[in-house]
Amino acid sequence: IRNQKHIKPWKYVLEPLSGYMLLAEKMSKNKIKNEHQSWNFAPKNKNCIPVKELIDLIQKYSPEKVKLICNKSKSRLKETTYLKLSSKKASKSINWNPKLNLNLTVKKICDWYETTNKTKNYLRTSEQHIKDFFKKKYSL
């Protein structure tokens, strides 16, 4: 970890994918006037937390304990200390909003890693996560 105090927008990989799929559907039906524009599919503002808090959540939901290793050396990389994205346009234009809160996001990610580490069946695990996500089958 370069800087555990930096704040980032954490999201489940299927969240933006669902946004892009909805956008493609709207474009195919000519419901978007100008398709040459940029789109953000961002998590909820509550999902923007410091890296250290994310590590704490991973430790909460992961059966394996995560060891936090901080890189104390000065990085030459310029890095934003507070990274936040806005998906207001997606919300307003195509009625897309993220579904998962941060706890559920981290739990789903930890579940995926735990299952794939045990079964080594990445395809089946990923397919099940996709089905659950689009059927709105969540439990915390």
Where do the PLM segments sit?
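Conserved C-terminal active-site "lid" loop/helix of NAD(P)H-dependent oxidoreductases
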Residues: 13, 38, 75-97, 118-121
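Amphipathic terminal alpha-helices
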Residues: 102-140
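C-terminal "lid/loop" region of Rossmann-like NAD(P)-dependent oxidoreductases
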Residues: 34-39, 49-55, 63-82, 122-130, ...
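Non-catalytic, hydrophobic alpha-helical segments
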Residues: 16, 20, 41, 51-54, ...
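Generic structural signal for alpha-helix termini and adjacent loop/cap motifs
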Residues: 23-30, 93, 112-116
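Alpha-helical substrate-binding/gating segment
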Residues: 11-39, 60
